[in-house]
Design a protein with these regions (language model features):
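N-terminal intrinsically disordered/low-complexity leader segments
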Residues: 1-21
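Helix-turn-helix
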Residues: 22-25, 29, 33-67, 71
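Amphipathic, non-transmembrane alpha-helical scaffold segments
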Residues: 27, 73, 77, 129-140
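Short amphipathic alpha-helical elements of helix-turn-helix/winged-helix folds
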Residues: 29-33, 108, 171
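Short coil/turn segments at alpha/beta junctions that flank glycine-rich nucleotide-binding fingerprints
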Residues: 36-40, 91, 112, 153-154
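Hydrophobic alpha-helical connector segments
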Residues: 71, 75, 82-111, 164-168
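Helix-loop "lid/cap" segments that line or gate small-molecule binding pockets
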Residues: 84-87, 103-109, 117-124, 197-201
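Hydrophobic/aromatic-rich alpha-helical bundle segments in the mid-to-C-terminal region
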Residues: 116-122, 129, 133, 137, ...
Length: 204
């Protein structure tokens, strides 16, 4: 399961609403900094300063920087899974769902996940890395399940649905390139072209 319980030392009093808010502020700030800058350039001191809390406060909620990174990334991936599911479920066709996913991702560009993880792996435990990979796999499997339905109905040629899911995700990373996004008037316009390119290869 991707949803993790917030760490609390044995015997520590139950969190108040203020403490919960502090947890969320730290987690949100850390998530943004990690995705913008990668793992190593981000310090707990910098996070504490931006959150207007002490470094000790961060350690109260998170045992270490690697654990904070892991929770930040898995929380983001869980949110991405939920948003992907919403886009796919509320759309009349898979094409419409992919377009919504692409538009949302392009509108909120961030560093390429694989690059960030490669840099952070040195500092993370095998268990932390596996939890993050599980989050990635869940999103790919969700997409793959929908591609499989289209394959079974004949909309898509017989292909590996998981490979299609990973290929689609990789294609969307082009939305992070300023030399590409600058040539389009909106995230929607670029999303439409990327989805069209994807379907040219995947469609029947």
């Amino acid at each position: 399961m991707m949803t993790k319980q917030r760490p609390r030392s044995p015997g520590r009093p139950k969190q108040t609403s203020d403490e919960t808010s502090t947890y969320d502020v730290i987690l949100g700030t850390a998530s943004r900094l990690f995705m913008e800058n990668g793992y190593e350039p981000v310090s707990l001191q910098h996070i504490a300063k931006l959150c207007n809390v002490t470094k000790a406060s961060i350690y109260y909620h998170f045992t270490s920087k690697p654990e904070l990174f892991k929770i930040a990334v898995t929380t983001m991936l869980q949110r991405g899974y939920e948003q992907t599911q919403i886009c796919l479920m509320k759309s009349g066709t898979l094409t419409e769902g992919l377009l919504l996913i692409a538009e949302a991702k392009i509108a909120r560009p961030h560093a390429e996940m694989e690059t960030i993880l490669r840099e952070a792996e040195t500092f993370l435990s095998k268990e932390q890395i596996e939890e993050i990979r599980d989050g990635e796999r869940a999103i790919h499997q969700l997409l793959a399940d929908h591609f499989e339905k289209e394959i079974q109905s004949g909309v898509i040629r017989q292909k590996n649905p998981l490979l299609l899911a990973q290929a689609f995700s990789a294609l969307l990373m082009l939305g992070n390139r300023e030399d590409i996004t600058s040539k389009y008037a909106s995230a929607r316009e670029l999303a439409e072209e990327l989805v069209e390119i994807f379907w040219q290869g995947a469609g029947s």
